[in-house]
From Swiss-Prot:
GO MF term list: flavin adenine dinucleotide binding
Binding site for NAD(+): 280-294
UniProt-recorded name of the protein: tRNA uridine 5-carboxymethylaminomethyl modification enzyme MnmG
Cited function: NAD-binding protein involved in the addition of a carboxymethylaminomethyl (cmnm) group at the wobble position (U34) of certain tRNAs, forming tRNA-cmnm(5)s(2)U34.
Chain positions recorded as FAD binding sites: G13, G14, G15, H16, A17, G18
Length: 667
């Protein structure tokens, strides 16, 4: 039967990509339907109970800056928070949180159920409705047909998924859930280029059977033994969200005996016996892969991470495996503190279908089928954070298409999301893709701390950011701007500053007049110290500093919430200290952007561009990049190729046309 109501956007899948896609489209005013095989698993953390990390935390902050759910849900469910790389530069600092699976999932479900314009329906999707070269809806396993103008497919590991434990395997989307076999077959009928990837998960341990006295303790920030100060928050709105109880993680290690046990199972490993065809993630390898690849290393760190506050289940991060269960049992018990460990769930590998993201347009719509968008692991990525960012992006662009508006694509210098999308659609994947700060050439501009400054205004323009977030953002931005201007206007004369005061705060006496902004650029000078100069005569009463503990409660000295004070000071300091480096990066961005967004003719026959090598013509014909910038990042396309292509376009297609003139004007 046809469902009586028609929708603007249908989202298939209720994982991290699907929930963000559905929320984004609904917030933009589109009638959105989220189809999931099980409402109880909305926002399920299928593998590790953590959010964030290097590069990944940056994506979470960007999703949050545009009104997404992941960071807020993490603040509600986070049971340990840490700032990674805290002693390094701001570009590579990242937030990571352990989350209570139940609390996290509950937060996501509440947001979904309370979002206007968003409907839920529990049924697996077996087919897509396609008319001509455009998708018009989805069909569930019992034949219910839902019509929509666009469909966002976020199938995770469910497409023809197969679980492996030793030489045994069975069809599954993840442990306990069936695979999407019919939907996978349907997508293959559409002739979309596809392949197989795999990922894995470790056995889960009953914490009551672990002797933690033999393990190292790893407290979170703000906990006894951890980095002093307040417990971090993930969301820019997180100051209003109380964290649950904070708990430590623990550390044990593999040893030579562990490695011998693992090697003894190689002959029954699906990875080494050819049972698994899919390629696994390079940066999250199985324990057997680690032992094989790093044979000279005699020990590996294993993190024992609590799954939640109401369970004893422990996630041993570092021993993801598809080895036979008897090997899993022995290797777990070979580690210190784990001698009597009881396994609650076996580890496994899962292989699944993905589709080549180079077959997507820049808005994540498939080239072959109009209105069909892909997001998450179906695009060859790995990780909750990468999935959430893609889901939001696809949901935004599906909604924009319904509204007959131009697609949105952040540039590589604007967001890690821009880096992620650009990498996928130009380079494709040969293994599961995960985000790192090293993938962003302009990472000094793409920090966690300024994600709101980069993206919240755009989120508001798109209809994603509510009034509360918008007001909070404007308040922060205005305070930062006013205080920055104040520091530039305040000058200190050496005749009016005692040498002892200058030495205390600045390290040495000053010999000429400086404004406070210039002094703040010095490496060893911080804002609080600067405000304490000469008895605090330069302090701003609106921004309390000194030795007071900036906690998450409202400061008694100011109407500003203390978490806002902290973020304002952070912005002012980073902007001052890295201004020169950021200016240099901006020059690089301008230089690179001269031709970056220059549109290439959709009907250009590259095979007829005789000046190009045959390989270049083939690659450009295959990928059909939309802009010159995208063309430059295709594998095998050299700067010389781009120059020759420009000559051809100027000579034959762009003569006396707007694209050429505007590009030359920029140059």
């Amino acid at each position: 039967m046809f469902y009586p109501q028609e929708f603007d956007v249908i989202v298939v899948g209720g994982g991290h990509a699907g929930t963000e896609a559905a929320l984004a489209a609904a917030r933009m005013g589109c009638k959105t339907l989220l189809l999931t095989h099980n409402i109880e698993t909305l926002g399920q953390m299928s593998c590790n109970p953590s959010i964030g990390g290097i590069g990944k935390g940056h994506l979470v902050k960007e999703v949050d800056a545009m009104g997404g759910a992941m960071a807020l849900a993490t603040d509600e469910g986070g049971i340990q928070f840490r700032i990674l790389n805290g002693s390094k530069g701001p570009a590579v600092r990242a937030t990571r949180a352990q989350a209570d699976r139940i609390l996290y999932k509950a937060a996501i479900r509440r947001m979904i159920e309370n979002q206007p314009n968003l409907w839920l329906f529990q049924q697996a999707v077996d087919d897509l409705m396609v008319e001509g070269d455009r998708v018009v809806g989805a069909v569930t396993q019992v034949g219910i047909k839902f019509r929509a103008r666009t469909v966002v497919l976020t199938a995770g590991t469910f497409l023809d998924g197969k679980i492996h434990v030793g030489l045994n395997n069975y069809p599954a989307g993840r442990a306990g859930d069936p695979p999407a076999v019919s939907l996978s077959a349907r997508l293959k009928e559409l002739k979309l280029p596809q392949g197989r990837l795999k990922t894995g998960t470790p056995p889960r341990i009953d914490g009551r059977s672990i002797d933690f006295s033999k393990c190292g303790v790893q407290p979170g920030d703000g906990m006894p033994g951890g980095t002093p100060g307040p417990v971090p928050v993930f969301s820019f709105m997180g100051g209003n969200v109380p964290h649950p109880k904070q708990v430590p993680c623990w550390i044990t290690h593999t040893n030579e005996r562990t490695h011998d046990i693992i090697r003894s199972g190689f002959d029954r490993s699906p990875m080494f016996t050819g049972k698994i065809d899919g390629v696994g993630p390079r940066y999250c390898p199985s324990v057997e892969d680690k032992i094989n690849r790093f044979a000279g290393k005699d020990s590996h760190q294993i993190f024992l991470e609590p799954e939640g506050l109401t369970t004893h289940e422990i996630y041993p991060n570092g021993i993801s495996t598809s080895l036979p269960f008897d090997i899993q049992y022995a290797l777990v018990r070979s580690m210190a503190g784990m001698e009597n460990a009881h396994i609650l769930r076996p580890g496994y590998a899962i292989e699944y279908d993905y589709f080549d993201p180079r077959a997507l347009k820049t808005n994540f719509e498939t080239r072959a089928i109009g209105g069909l968008f892909f997001a998450g692991q179906i695009n060859g990525t790995t990780g909750y954070e990468e999935a959430a960012a893609q889901g939001m992006f696809a949901g935004i662009n599906a909604a924009l298409q319904c509204q007959e508006k131009e697609a949105w694509l952040p540039k590589r210098d604007e967001a890690y999301l821009g880096v992620l999308v650009d990498d996928l659609i130009t380079k494709g994947v040969t293994e599961p893709y995960r985000m790192f700060t090293s993938r962003a050439e302009f990472r000094l501009m793409l920090r966690e701390d300024n994600a709101d400054m980069r993206l919240t205004e755009k989120g508001r323009e798109l209809g994603l950011v509510d009034d509360a977030r918008w007001d909070a953002f404007n308040r922060k931005r205005d305070i930062v701007s006013r205080e920055t201007q104040r520091l530039r206007a305040l000058w200190i004369n050496p005749n009016n500053l005692p040498a002892s005061e200058a030495e205390r705060v600045l390290g040495k006496a000053i010999e000429r007049e400086y404004n406070l902004a210039d002094l703040l650029r010095r490496p060893d000078v911080n804002y609080a110290g600067l405000m304490s100069l000469d008895g605090g005569r330069y302090a701003n009463p609106e921004i309390p500093t000194g030795n007071e503990d900036v906690s998450r409660e409202t400061s008694t000295d100011s109407a500003l919430p203390a978490d806002l004070v902290k973020s304002v000071i952070e912005q002012i300091e980073i902007t001052a200290k890295y201004a020169g480096y950021i200016d240099l990066q901006k020059v690089e961005v301008e230089r690179a952007s001269h031709y970056e967004n220059l549109k290439l003719p959709a009907d250009l026959d590259y095979l007829q561009v005789s000046a190009l090598s045959f390989e270049a013509r083939q690659m450009l014909s295959k990928h059909r990049p939309e802009t010159l910038g995208l063309a430059s990042r295709i594998q095998g396309i050299t700067p010389a190729t781009i120059s020759l292509l420009l000559v051809h376009l100027k000579k034959n297609l762009w003569k006396n046309t707007t694209p050429l003139k505007s590009a030359e004007a920029e140059a």
